[in-house]
């Protein structure tokens, strides 16, 4: 039995390694997924009800963009009703369902949509690839922001994989997704809910032309126990919550958690909300 368990763990490890390397090295998805499936099937032959096998198999399918099949593997875990991965499987099913509903249209969108936390660079990529914001604004007659940039591009985006997308967004000039006072963009920093809300507020104003949105919630008592009404991001967070672009962080306390992260699926759902609200056509 110990020998079988060692073999099972080895097969699971192989499936995980093949999947991680496949994504990191940008190998053909079908090729690395087939190799990972072989490893998991070998593990399954040893113990078909092992939750580690099902969990990591689901993760590999999700990494390959096979969200429906990934969800089926997670449902197999949930049928047990108990076990080490039950709580995680419930959360993962919810995340995958969000990603499926958001229906990303680009390869980058699919990859970013599966992340539990996205970076400032990844948010810029989604705004260009999924919302097509620069193209949309040009079509509506908006010129690039003359005050969006300092004299030079931020030095820390020069070697970023998202350099091109970040430059496009910087030309738009979104508050919350702009250059910091020290001249850097910090592309790899986690996007905070406050920054995300500020950028969404700026997009709402650009698409609607309603400048009053900047101060719609100013002067009122705070709706959130963890954020003062005079905070720089208060108006944007309140606006995004009311417009369905953001959800409350803690339903029990009502906390908004301005410094918390944003998931890729939630970001994509917000983009779909923009497209539906403004009947976006390209």
Stretches found by the model and what they are:
Residues 5, 10-12, 48:
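Residue signature of alpha-solenoid helical repeat architecture, marking inter-repeat boundaries
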Residues 13, 56, 89-92:
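Canonical tetratricopeptide repeat
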Residues 36-40:
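Repeat-mediated protein-protein interaction surfaces in helical alpha-solenoids
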Residues 173, 244:
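Glycine-centered, phosphate/nucleic-acid-interacting loop/turn motifs that mediate DNA/RNA or nucleotide
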């Amino acid at each position: 039995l110990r020998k079988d368990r060692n073999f099972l763990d080895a097969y699971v490890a192989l499936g995980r390694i093949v999947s991680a390397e496949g994504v990191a090295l940008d190998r053909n998805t079908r090729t690395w997924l087939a190799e990972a499936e072989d490893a998991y099937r070998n593990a399954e032959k040893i113990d078909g009800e092992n939750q580690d096998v099902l969990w990591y198999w689901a993760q590999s399918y999700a990494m390959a963009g096979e969200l429906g099949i990934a969800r089926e593997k997670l449902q197999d875990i949930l049928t047990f009703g108990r076990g080490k991965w039950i709580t995680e499987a419930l959360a993962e099913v919810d995340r995958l369902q969000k990603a499926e509903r958001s229906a990303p249209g680009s390869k980058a969108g699919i990859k970013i949509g599966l992340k539990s936390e996205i970076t400032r660079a990844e948010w810029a990529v989604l705004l260009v690839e999924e919302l097509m914001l620069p193209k949309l604004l040009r079509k509506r007659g908006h010129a690039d922001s003359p005050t969006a940039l300092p004299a030079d591009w931020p030095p820390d985006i020069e070697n970023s994989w998202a350099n091109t997308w970040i430059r496009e967004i910087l030309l738009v000039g979104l508050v919350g997704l702009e250059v910091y006072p020290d001249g850097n963009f910090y592309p790899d920093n986690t996007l905070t809910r406050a920054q995300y809300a500020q950028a969404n507020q700026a997009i709402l104003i650009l698409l609607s032309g309603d400048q009053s949105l900047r101060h719609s919630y100013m002067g009122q008592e705070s709706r959130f126990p963890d954020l003062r009404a005079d905070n720089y991001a208060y108006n944007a967070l309140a606006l995004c919550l009311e417009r369905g672009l953001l959800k409350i962080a803690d339903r029990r306390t009502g906390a908004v958690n301005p410094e918390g992260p944003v998931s890729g699926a939630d970001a994509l759902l917000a983009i779909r909300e923009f497209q539906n609200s403004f009947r976006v056509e390209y």
